[in-house]
Amino acid sequence: MSKDKNKNVCKNLSFAECELTILRMAVDKAGEKMGKRSVNSPDVQNIINIVEDFIKRKNLICYGGTAINSILPEEDQFYNKDVEIPDYDFFSFDALKDAKELADIYFKKGFTDVEAKSGQHHGTYKVFVNYIAVADITYIPKGIFNALKKDSLRVDGVLYAPPNFLRMSMYLELSRPAGDISRWEKVLKRLLLLNKNYQITDVNCNNVDFQRKMANVENQEIIYETVEKALINQGVVFFGGFANALYSQYMPHQQRQKLEHYADFDVLSNDPETTAEIVKERLIDKGIKNIKIIKQDAVGEIVPEHYEVKIGKDSVLFAYKPIGCHSYNVLISKGKKLKIATIDTMLSLYLAFLYADKDYYNQFIDRILCMSKFLFDVQQKNRLQQKGLLQRFSIICYGHQDSIEEMKAEKAAKYKELKQSGNKKELEEWFLNYKPDDIKNTPTKEIKTYKNKEKKPKKKTIKKRVVNPYDNKSRKNKKWLY
């Protein structure tokens, strides 16, 4: 590096800071040189081509950093393909089978150091070739897979998850202060690039209602006040049309959404069944009849288990069990403390509903998209306010976030349970450790033949020794969502 260049780099820096800056530049330069050498090697190029061909042939859906990078215009891409080996994350509705199949393909192509292993997250399998992580294959139910595929973008023959799904994954991560916050800066940078190039919706939202209207308007005001009070008293977190209307106060008058007294509530509750039961009891106290509670199962891992409260044909409440620890802010209204989900939390949930393939979401797709766009606009217009409901990256959260230690303990307990039960299929699903080379080289004992004077020759076959694929520890798996 020339002296003149050193002076420019070190302008306004102390001697020690300048020395460290020069060191970092040297490290970056050396890393780039080694990266180019690795990426351009024939073996690595072959490895990349094989996994890309596999994804194309099976029409699997890529997600994560590689997906975001691939759908951005070249000037906004953050990966340098000349120095970085792409790590493909993709969805499959038959992930275990696909992981083993991909490992077999590499082995047949002449690679001997090949293995497919379970990740830390159940349902995710990692494929390694020559000790390089080349693929993370994550299971999702076929219904979600098909919903994603419908809106996926194809680039050079590879399917990439829809922008709104990729956006949802990043909002989800930014809404979990008890998660891996060391990733937040990287995630936000990528989210800004995605938002710059892809809008949430092009639907005309001027005539879209943000609250569910009730078909039966009789006792509408009583129902609204009763449900609202019951939910506030339970300390749940609001995130539906009720919460959306509260955020509208931060928009210009002509863009504000009026909060109508429709019983239209969506909340997070640590015990959604109890929340629904209490709401039903309070409604009965007010003489309301024809109330029923419907349990709705989780949709993969994008929409949690929830309970719907209906009065006749009208849905007045959806209470969801948290799938992590979701950030919220506190609003004091009429002397009451209301917990309102942050915009990041609300967007992560709304955008997930788009791919749940449930009738009660599908009939309100435009509403969900427009509510999401409205919240996005609120956030953009008030990005640096950091007060009241607008405080972003709140460190208070609702729900439980599993730690790495808890996940490891769960897997250890599961391994013990499955070993005792002898359920080999489920054991493999949880603890896959598949090495094609070991299967090929498993020794077989000689087959001996015994003769008896009075009997015909009879063969006795000794079965092949089965290798236990679960002896090794699993490599730590990175987060599947992003």
How should each PLM-predicted stretch be described?
Residues V44-L96, I222-E273:
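Active-site nucleotide-donor binding segment shared across nucleotidyl transfer reactions
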Residues M1-N46, R154-I222, N441-K458, I462-Y470, ...:
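N-terminal regions immediately upstream of nucleotidyltransferase
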Residues V9-N12, Y131, K313-S315, G335:
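Residue-level detection of beta-strand-connecting loop/turn positions
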Residues D104-N146, R282-Y328:
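Conserved catalytic core of two-metal-ion nucleotidyltransferases
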Residues A135-M214, S315-Y450:
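Active-site and adjacent loop segments of nucleotide-processing enzymes
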Residues L96-A103, E273-K280:
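Short, conserved charged micro-motifs
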